[in-house]
């Protein structure tokens, strides 16, 4: 039975196994068509989990070294494989577009291809783990202690002081927003947010019967003077804020700006809901989350959906102790409990360090796509961060955002009009949000951005009708 000699200790074990496979195939130690050990056999020989071996085999298949056949096992590939694409595959030919096909650049999500191979092994490990039976049962309020501790481990990359006792598990970040707003404010309370904000906040405020006001913004997000003036006129109960890579504008608050916002919250006695869903994309990791500037009046929210995979519907609320019981009660009354099975999968990903490896890959992929956008959108006013998944395109006159969005779709590209992000419909916006991470292939993204550049550069929109 083949057992690899592992030389590298500065990388994940599964990568060392994949490297050993490549080395032994190249040297002739492993022959074309040779059958490899089963997951369990090699896991026992190396004293690792079957999930680790599954990830190693999947990585080797991605490199074109192996092939698998259902019921027969895994074999050394008999014929050379096609070159393995990068997460965003480079174009082999000029872009083509099928009639009626629309490229969707409207949904913010991570690169699915980057995570899929890695997560197959995590799913195998979940099924074989000692906590599998517990993950099939009901969970206590707030979540199982080990799941809350894994949440705290994820949070410590931004909040070093995080502990599992102050973590509440939710069914994703959107559920976390609903839980926090429902539990900590009352009907007809005033909720503040950015003047251009995540549409999910707008729909929540409407369905929960909260009043919503948008605060004026600049390049760093909410303007302190505008926030203070609004607080002098009305009494807000909560500020919902995205301080890093804000959706849709990508605005990111400086250290000084966060201090000012926290001081205003203290002065006017309102809560802060710090939605840090994109915090892992920060270009300056030294800047702390907004919640850490006013920890006793802040609830911090994040999830793994944007860094790992949208289907991983697990979010984490981090709260001061005095608010925990209200948050856990609202989780119970809304969904009874987030899925313990999904929470266990998320915990395994965090505990094995897979989350940080995926964060690194997603950041690298986002940076590549931002560079491509700068190349293909010359002369246009765009707002973006070096690692943000999206950009904000400010349209020249005489465009309106709604008109541009309609015509872009007719040209085969779907983006979102700035009107969908307006907390209050009190004027026209000329901005549109363009998501760069959705297309799988570089030629698709190139086509979409080229179409948008051509459209935005037109002096007379009427010629597209």
Residue ranges with predicted function:
Residues 299-363, 460-461:
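Conserved core segment of the aminotransferase class I/II
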